[in-house]
Amino acid sequence: MAVPKKRTSISKKRIRKNIWKRKGYGAALKALSLGKSLSTGSSKSFFVRQTNKS
């Protein structure tokens, strides 16, 4: 089994953690943007079937 030889420095750990957080933030922004465009009806990539409740 592979074992790391030295301890990872705090700065390197912080950099990796921030990269990981930024990826999540970007995914959340995309999801929010897609949700907004679907709710307003301005989405060009999705077709939402409208149901008439009358």
UniProtKB/Swiss-Prot annotation:
The keyword Ribosomal protein applies. Its main location: plastid. It comes from Helianthus annuus. This is Large ribosomal subunit protein bL32c. The keyword Ribonucleoprotein applies. Keywords: Chloroplast, Plastid, Ribonucleoprotein, Ribosomal protein. It is found in: Plastid, Chloroplast. GO terms for molecular function: structural constituent of ribosome. GO terms for biological process: translation. InterPro entries: Ribosomal_bL32, Ribosomal_bL32_plant/cyanobact, Ribosomal_zn-bd.
